[in-house]
Amino acid sequence: MELKVTTLEGKDAGSVQLSDAIFGLEPRVDIIQRCVQWQLNKRQAGTHKAKGRAEIWRTGKKMYKQKGTGGARHGSARVPQFRGGGRAFGPVVRSHATDLPKKVRALALKHALSAKAKDGDLVVLENATLEAAKTKALIGHFSGLGLTNALIIDGAELHNGFAAAARNIPNLDVLPIQGINVYDILRRQKLVLTKAAIDALEARFK
């Protein structure tokens, strides 16, 4: 697969040959969905908590005598059916993380990249550098390229000026190649890869 390379100013900078093993697969929604669910499960806080009957601060004395009152045979005021009692089967602090094999995660990333390429939502930039860290100037460049909702992936090191200028632009994410992931690729309309990012991806999946 061949895509044209453009500069931040919108000028033509040649073309690049993309590996069909990474960008030319037929996207499988089931694999992508498994990876997205794995990511969302992993980042869920799991700090929810409700007190059970053993954790309620209340006397453990029997409420009233067993027989002769005509009432039910209650033994404790901490039980769930009373106001102020403990919660039955309430949420506890736990991890929501699930397991997903590394090979499935890698395959899901390839399918997400292939999906963007197939839909025509993949843009290749020569580089992501900016001389002056000015957000207004960067917005102008992106408007010229038609990028209003995008994820930009650069090489191992982000350019400080570019990252600083992009930080305050809504619907725009900038990540180094180490941070590329399926969920962030799918949540943005366009995927922008620099030539350094493409080289890193091909080296990773070699």
Swiss-Prot record:
Oligomeric and partner information: Part of the 50S ribosomal subunit.
Protein keywords: Ribonucleoprotein, Ribosomal protein, RNA-binding, rRNA-binding
GO MF annotations, alphabetized: rRNA binding; structural constituent of ribosome
Species of the source: Bradyrhizobium sp. (strain BTAi1 / ATCC BAA-1182)
Known role: One of the primary rRNA binding proteins, this protein initially binds near the 5'-end of the 23S rRNA. It is important during the early stages of 50S assembly. It makes multiple contacts with different domains of the 23S rRNA in the assembled 50S subunit and ribosome. Forms part of the polypeptide exit tunnel.
Name assigned to this protein: Large ribosomal subunit protein uL4
GO CC annotations on file: ribonucleoprotein complex; ribosome
Family, similarity comment: Belongs to the universal ribosomal protein uL4 family.
Lineage start: Bacteria, Pseudomonadati, Pseudomonadota, Alphaproteobacteria, Hyphomicrobiales
InterPro entries: Ribosomal_uL4, Ribosomal_uL4-like, Ribosomal_uL4_dom_sf
GO biological process: translation
Gene responsible for this protein: rplD
